[in-house]
């Protein structure tokens, strides 16, 4: 009999815990309405950015409160009494929101039983993260969202992840192609702007090597190792001695490292971040050095996907980006990753404006996915630049873009930065090696590379 009574007491106690947990979840409210009564709505006519933002909100609410809110498409479901509306939908609240935002700004509005989040392209990810961090807590709460349009900027935290995006051959006018060409590229977002211009901090970089106008080997080595070197050398200084790369520095700091490119892994730029060789065409030497990097440093080298169709850009390339980031983020100390779009350079060598534009749009797609990651992981610094300009591209007398060379030039290239410390690059024209110096400084090394003439920014 005593055993039965004890068992009943245990079951009663367990039931009380379950009921308390249920009460805990049910007592979470937004503007006085139970969070459990809301559905999350996304636009099936909008870009995938909005769908992924809606998924993120759903997942975070489940993780934080135990509530599994329904995720529904805008056009296929009637209006619910209480909704969290993500992106540009046909819901009345979306039309009411319709805010004028600039750069990385996003808008939030509460109206009646609905809440709406709105932003351009990938910036909706920043809105989703802000919404969850601000209004979805892990305890009993009653959050209040203003019933008037509020404009916000993304949350930024101290950086522990570093992403360097390189558009090979991408000069200033390559990023301006959207002003001259119609974007009917099938795998694009229909965008009319290079995504770097959404970032708040812009500057320029000088690209000369010790040989004069740089090639991709010396240009890549400058960005990877913080040394000016001789054309053709991979990860080596002017005396042909191996020099430390940011990828290797990451390993020293206990971080993960990765190298990605649409070029093959023995291409000059990915090689500069993953190998040491006395010639950019020494493929056997480069492959052996990269094998050592994988074995010694655990460097992820994922290269060689030159696709120009919706199917492959939206699945293969974007999946590779997602998978690589997922592997790198497993390191609790953070990571360094370089990603290169290699084919802007190749098409500019051939003076093929349309194919170069397709490569720029493809680079934009990669930038969008990386920026999504940054917004969901605000402890990430990101910088977009080029190793050099190719083709001497600028408008002719009739206002049309025109090539004036088939080779590399000494033209300055753009720098776009976002995240903790990114303001150091704003409005400045820097040497390419200073980009490496400054990222290394952020990673905790103030003596990285050759700083005899130029140092990290902020010193």
What do the PLM-derived regions correspond to, one by one?
Residues 9-13, 17:
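Hydrophobic core
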Residues 51-58, 125-129, 220, 244-247, ...:
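Extracytoplasmic/secreted envelope proteins and their assembly/folding machinery
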Residues 68-72, 237, 306-322:
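Functional beta-strand-loop-alpha-helix junction segments that form "active/interaction loops"
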Residues 267-275, 308, 312, 321-325, ...:
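Active-site His/acidic residue clusters
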Residues 21-154:
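Solvent-exposed alpha-helical segments and adjacent loops
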Residues 1-4:
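Positively charged n-region of N-terminal signal peptides that target proteins for export
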Residues 147, 153-305, 309, 364, ...:
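N-terminal catalytic scaffold of extracellular/periplasmic and nuclease hydrolases
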Residues 383-386:
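Active-site neighborhood of phospho(di)ester-bond hydrolases with catalytic His/Asp-centered motifs
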């Amino acid at each position: 009999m005593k055993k039965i009574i004890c068992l009943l007491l245990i079951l009663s106690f367990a039931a009380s815990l379950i009921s308390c947990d249920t009460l805990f979840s049910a007592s979470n409210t937004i503007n006085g309405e139970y969070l459990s009564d809301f559905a999350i709505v996304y636009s099936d006519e909008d870009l995938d950015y909005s769908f992924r933002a809606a998924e993120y909100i759903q997942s975070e609410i489940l993780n934080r409160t135990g509530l599994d809110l329904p995720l529904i498409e805008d056009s296929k479901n009637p209006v619910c009494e209480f909704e969290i509306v993500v992106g540009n939908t046909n819901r009345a609240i979306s039309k009411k929101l319709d805010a004028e935002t600039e750069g990385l700004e996003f808008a939030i509005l509460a109206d009646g039983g609905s809440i709406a989040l709105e932003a351009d392209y990938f910036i909706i990810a920043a809105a989703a993260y802000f919404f969850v961090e601000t209004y979805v807590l892990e305890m009993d709460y009653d959050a209040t969202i203003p019933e008037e349009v509020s404009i916000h900027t993304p949350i930024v935290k101290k950086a522990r992840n570093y992403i360097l995006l390189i558009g090979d051959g991408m000069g200033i006018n390559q990023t301006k192609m959207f002003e001259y060409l119609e974007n009917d590229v099938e795998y694009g977002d229909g965008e009319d702007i290079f995504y770097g211009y959404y970032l708040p901090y812009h500057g320029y970089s000088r690209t000369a090597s010790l040989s004069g106008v740089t090639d991709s080997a010396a240009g890549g080595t400058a960005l990877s190792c913080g040394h000016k070197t001789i054309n053709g050398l991979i990860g080596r200084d002017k005396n042909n001695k191996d020099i430390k790369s940011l990828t290797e520095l990451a390993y020293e700091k206990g971080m993960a490292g990765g190298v990605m490119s649409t070029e093959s892994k023995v291409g000059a730029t990915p090689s500069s971040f993953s190998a040491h060789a006395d010639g950019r065409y020494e493929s056997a030497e480069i492959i052996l050095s990269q094998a050592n990097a994988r074995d010694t440093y655990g460097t992820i080298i994922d290269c060689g996907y030159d696709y120009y169709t919706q199917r492959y850009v939206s699945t293969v390339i974007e999946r590779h980006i997602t998978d690589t980031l997922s592997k790198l983020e497993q390191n609790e100390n953070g990571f360094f990753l370089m990603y290169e779009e290699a084919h802007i350079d190749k098409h500019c060598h051939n003076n093929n404006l349309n194919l170069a534009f397709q490569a720029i749009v493809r680079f934009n797609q990669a930038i969008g996915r990386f920026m999504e990651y940054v917004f969901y992981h605000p402890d990430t610094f990101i910088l977009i630049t080029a190793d050099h300009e190719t083709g001497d591209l600028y408008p002719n007398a009739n206002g049309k873009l025109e090539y004036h060379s088939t080779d590399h030039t000494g033209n300055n290239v753009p720098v776009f930065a976002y995240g903790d410390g990114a303001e150091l690059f704003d409005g400045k024209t820097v040497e390419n090696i200073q980009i490496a110096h400054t990222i290394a400084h952020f990673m905790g090394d103030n003596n990285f590379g050759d700083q005899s003439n130029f140092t990290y920014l902020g010193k």
